[in-house]
Amino acid sequence: MSNSVVHNLLNRGLIRPLNFEHQNKLNSSVYQTSTANPALGKIGRSKLYGKGLKQAGRSLVTETGGRPLSFVPRAVLAMDPQAAEKFSLDGNIDLLVEVTSTTVREVNIQIAYTSDTLFLHWGAILDNKENWVLPSRSPDRTQNFKNSALRTPFVKSGGNSHLKLEIDDPAIHAIEFLIFDESRNKWYKNNGQNFHINLPTERNVKQNVSVPEDLVQIQAYLRWERKGKQMYNPEKEKEEYEAARTELREEMMRGASVEDLRAKLLKKDNSNESPKSNGTSSSGREEKKKVSKQPERKKNYNTDKIQRKGRDLTKLIYKHVADFVEPESKSSSEPRSLTTLEIYAKAKEEQETTPVFSKKTFKLEGSAILVFVTKLSGKTKIHVATDFKEPVTLHWALSQKGGEWLDPPSDILPPNSLPVRGAVDTKLTITSTDLPSPVQTFELEIEGDSYKGMPFVLNAGERWIKNNDSDFYVDFAKEEKHVQKDYGDGKGTAKHLLDKIADLESEAQKSFMHRFNIAADLVDEAKSAGQLGFAGILVWMRFMATRQLVWNKNYNVKPREISKAQDRLTDLLQDVYASYPEYRELLRMIMSTVGRGGEGDVGQRIRDEILVIQRKNDCKGGIMEEWHQKLHNNTSPDDVVICQALMDYIKSDFDLSVYWKTLNDNGITKERLLSYDRAIHSEPNFRGEQKDGLLRDLGHYMRTLKAVHSGADLESAIQNCMGYQDDGEGFMVGVQINPVSGLPSGYPDLLRFVLEHVEEKNVEPLLEGLLEARQELRPLLLKSHDRLKDLLFLDLALDSTVRTAIERGYEQLNDAGPEKIMYFISLVLENLALSSDDNEDLIYCLKGWQFALDMCKSKKDHWALYAKSVLDRSRLALASKAERYLEILQPSAEYLGSCLGVDQSAVSIFTEEIIRAGSAAALSSLVNRLDPVLRKTANLGSWQVISPVEVVGYVIVVDELLTVQNKTYDRPTIIVANRVRGEEEIPDGAVAVLTPDMPDVLSHVSVRARNGKICFATCFDSGILSDLQGKDGKLLSLQPTSADVVYKEVNDSELSSPSSDNLEDAPPSISLVKKQFAGRYAISSEEFTSDLVGAKSRNIGYLKGKVPSWVGIPTSVALPFGVFEKVISEKANQAVNDKLLVLKKTLDEGDQGALKEIRQTLLGLVAPPELVEELKSTMKSSDMPWPGDEGEQRWEQAWAAIKKVWASKWNERAYFSTRKVKLDHDYLCMAVLVQEVINADYAFVIHTTNPSSGDSSEIYAEVVKGLGETLVGAYPGRSLSFICKKNNLDSPLVLGYPSKPIGLFIRRSIIFRSDSNGEDLEGYAGAGLYDSVPMDEEDQVVLDYTTDPLITDLSFQKKVLSDIARAGDAIEKLYGTAQDIEGVIRDGKLYVVQTRPQV
């Protein structure tokens, strides 16, 4: 209708104005008046409306009368491929009809009138037909009216009513309708006739209308601009170009001339130009658009390889890591109360004399079924219990194989049993003794092993209770390796949140929509619980994703409802990701298990598209119909696998084994297909002529499925970010995804490069492209973005593709040299660092690999030795990450798994599977490939022998040496320990410790091994280690050399060999002289004597003034022997002393837990005023800073450090060590050496006789960055080690480069060193047993060795190492015996902080 007509009608007051959304888009010739269509004059023949409807010319009237209105429609050219027509009913009611005239044919009808009983009475017109037909697709609540018309109710919206029809049958070329208000019995017509709406058809479009190519190019460009300048592949480019041609043909069919189109397009195009270009001539602009058909592309990448950008790797460091905090809420500390069933089961298990063979809990709504099996002497006992409130009958049988029901023998039937055909009905026995509520039970005992299982279902009244539409089944042939445990306390978890999840699981299992909405509701609570809250959500979602939880139970849900719930959850997770950087790694993992979700249209496509596939390919029955029903009922990630299995089946020329292989490889069995609410019974059985069409359509459908279910699918993720439009087909809804804004320049080309190389055998270019894409994307992930979720899923997909690519590339590394393997390691490490919250150590490992690669390419000496240190550090980083995951995730997995009845085997390996799913597993595999290559190149061998002693003993395999350090073996034992930290004691009876771990040669455990004549060695070869572990319990002979360990199995007769006699040697006779308080609280170094201080203090005092001038000795004072005993005897400390006496008695009775309590108690000591004054005076007179000058708080820090040194007399290691050699612990006295801390650049330890070889002509030393505590304490990794001949001190030889990730640094401070009378006794190595405590906390710094001149500057390295060797040689000459020396280097100056005789 023209604007003039509307204006006239408004002025005449005949119609009420109505603001429709598209009222400015008036109709084209698609809409016609009744006289333009011959069918309209024959309404009477259709016998649809009765006799009262008569043709009344061209005026619009109603049956009940009304004012006629003249109506003359006009065709108006519209840019938009939609057309709209407005009518007036009764002279004052507006009616608007719009038709979408492109691929999707929709008829939108709006009327400015409302009624609860307003209907559209309608039908369709086929080609050259007059009578109505009923379309197969109609809106909800449509009714069939006498099989001759459809009646569809309008939907009210404000003061208007509206309705949308979707027409998918291409044979329909028009619809006709009337409007009927049932409550008023009133019909609205078009001048007494049907409203007749023509629909565009493919035939119309394909008429031979010629459109100039230059106009098609401009239209294609404008379409591309409208759709957000998306990235198109060649196929999509062609499709868009032809769509542009079709749009222009349609306009010409409506009457537009070529000149009209040209004028309109050029005007439209000009509006997009800058003001500066508006003066360009028409012909110039036309020529410009001829070359603008597609967006310009920057060809940054050739077809073979990309050029990676140079980046400062330190800019990638990400330190947002959540502190591990145990929730402090009351609910977290309270143990979970056992359920009635758990109490019953616990009591039953205690009654049984045999361990539980298998145990399982089936969770039902509001109740549960517990089944456990025990076996003894050929008898199998089955226990079934349930907490159902109403009486229950067990309908059961026995089976010899899965799926069968066999009549049980009559002589084994329990009481209240009634045999029925092929089964038995047994009424359960009600038990309530000592239980909070009644339990119904069943017990069965079977002789022999002829039966393998027991199928059953329950009957309660009129209800049959099954296991998700399948029978329950008790398997008593297969023993559970991990019988489900009860983790009732929930320690280390967000227990309150996990309890809530467990309570809501019965609701969550109804459908994915329920589960995702419940998870979304819990996000705020998870946020409050912190890291452990999101760990709980991850565990729950991971149990879901791995099919440990029920996906759908008695509930139908539309795909669009699932995708909407997904969308809600992932939107919330996206918001948390943006606001809480410390949880990002966990959130990434949660999102990868949930999937992306999408707006309703994306989910709806799952439902619509399968119908189109069935119709187009003539496969409406069998598996396609069953799958269609499942998809409509409750789509899930299984559908991605089913779709892939169908495509693989078709590609294999319909080989059913291929179909089943794809399903089974992805965890879908026949039983699972049958377990769906809409079960899939049939196997595929397609015809040859269906092959091409199904492959094409299922391939397109896979994209729809992955868009909802597969967050980490690369192609889907790229499309979501680059944007795409899919107009659908027939009745399918269209989908338009706009491109993400703000992507880096050239990014589409980079992603196109990735897609083009994603399946190539040579994975190196692909890996480079993937990592470059992740690096380019990273800045956008670190700030807010309206499409952050899509960027995250793209990054997850790129990350996942790196992992799959590297696994595919293992084969090409089989014959590769170390340079290639190192490069691949650096790529995978980069990928892991980009996915980690706390990646500083990983980044420095990455820098180390790049430095090693440069050394290798330059063929520098020691490149392999240096690369080995980086490899060792990388292993440590992986181990640290695994331990972190274990600490955060495993407690939640165990607690929630117990609550939800998850299979124990899935719970026990939960964290392990999480790690395997990431880049860490690929990195570990590559490192293991490279290790033997580097060891061979660097001539390192398979062993490092720390204490070479020949021994014979029985092998025992343990995880950690720490767990057995206080054990006593009654026969010679060779311990193979996966983990040795360096601080442990070696247990009595052990003759050897073998480990893959790498404690320092000078660590406490190394010193103890050498002193105790115990063989101690590190094994670097995983094959040798596995062989040793396989000899658990066997008697072995070990024959170590300085670089190898030869071992063999021997007979018991060889136990008498001299080499193993050290086990029988009695501990040396050692005694301590108890020291007394000499009346002094503090003394200077000049007063150090054996009566007042230990060897540590005396040696420092002795060195002063005797060492070369270039060797510094720190100023020292001491709290002498007896001060501790004097302080604790003071009246002010009476309570502490009394408690100490009680705890010592407890300790003597064997309670080792008292040691920790003693140390804690001693921190309550009060310093006597005399001690404070005397220590202050002594320190100041020795030119040492007095802490109290900086405030009372600083003195309190110093006093706390002194007390910790005294308390270390009762640390576990020291206490058991003195017990082992039968020293009287009460006679052990502790002086405290007080020194100013030198904030070291490096710390070192020297042994002036090589401890590994015993060569006295050779100095051995180790150096670390920062303070020496990382060298002598239990800090992972190796230090820099070197040897130096005493006759050539200027030529140190590096044996190994450092792999310690952490260095300790401290402000100017004071350190309080333990100096007991039990250290350095002949025959007993007491050094290192007791603590030295600085008054300030050290700062832990992650080390970057690529910027350390000790590694990178060979001349600096030579000078520092030579100075250390010369200092050691000078001190040895001063004492005349081999020395164990500790020192530091600060600003090039060397200081010795202590020395003692080398053991």
UniProtKB/Swiss-Prot annotation:
It is an enzyme of class 2 (transferase). Residues 265-306 are annotated as: Disordered. It is found in: Plastid, Chloroplast. One of its GO terms (cellular component) is chloroplast envelope. The modification N-acetylvaline is found at residue 76. Residues 1-75 form a transit peptide. Pfam families: DUF7067, GWD1_pHisD, Ig_N_CWD1, PPDK_N. The reaction takes place in three steps, mediated by a phosphocarrier histidine residue located on the surface of the central domain. The two first partial reactions are catalyzed at an active site located on the C-terminal domain, and the third partial reaction is catalyzed at an active site located on the N-terminal domain. For catalytic turnover, the central domain swivels from the concave surface of the C-terminal domain to that of the N-terminal domain. The N-terminal domain contains the alpha-glucan binding site, the central domain the pyrophosphate/phosphate carrier histidine, and the C-terminal domain the ATP binding site. This is Alpha-glucan water dikinase 1, chloroplastic. The lineage of its organism: Eukaryota, Viridiplantae, Streptophyta, Embryophyta, Tracheophyta.
